[in-house]
Amino acid sequence: TRIDDDLQTSLRLLVARATQLPLEKLQQVCATYRELHFSRGVITLALAAARASDAADIALAFRADGCPEEVSHSRTVYQQRRAMYALVLDTLGALDAQLDTASNALVGTKDAAAHTRAADAEKERRDAYALATQSDDPLFHEELYTWLLAHGRTGQLLELHTPFLEEFLQGVPVLLNGESYATYVRGLRDLLWQLHVRRGDFFAAAQTLDELAHADAFALKLSERIEYLALAVGNAKSVRPSAQVHAQEVIGFATQLDEDLEVAQVQAKILGALQPLDTLDWDEEEKA
């Protein structure tokens, strides 16, 4: 249509001048695009503007340094890029809500129009996420993954096929969604081994679980350590030797895991036997 052609033309012209587009103007344009249901325009323009605003990748270097807290030009550039990414995330969130509304409207109805609206909403959302995840901007991917986790969309996160996801799950986070560092990192590693399982890399899953079981930073209960080790054993036994993982390496690793699991289980039995004795000693003192 004429409107679609005009929107595409405006997008092309704005992307070409993205370096000259201040944040406030970008926000205004994206708001207009959203009103016109031009999600592709919001995503394309906001991501282009974020990269154009920081051609030297100052924000990327700032993130690599762990986002130092002191006020600096680098922090300002980083925060500006985050504000631009937020326009994309707001659009994705609106499409999620639109699909939820359309899907809920299907309950108890066979109305053809309602089914068409739901199908259209699903397609618009799917296309938007596909476009966003095609970005080669690592900072945006970190924002997207963190946002998905904050909204409890772990299943959706693990379904993504991007070259940045594994690195994010095994990396050092700076955006913690209000959680403690140890709690957030443990959550990432839990998702990492699940990602490996989804991809059929059982050896990597077993290694991640083994690292979780032996990580002092997480202050695991013995029962949690046993659970991680049991999962590691199960994954190790699912590994098929290959050019990347030799049979001897798999056998040695699985044996070590079995031994660690057995030791942990013995510790649990001993603790279980000692607890009634502690209670008994306490009762005897009370009687005395």
Per-segment meaning from a language model:
Residues 1-288:
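Extended alpha-helical assembly domains of large eukaryotic scaffold proteins
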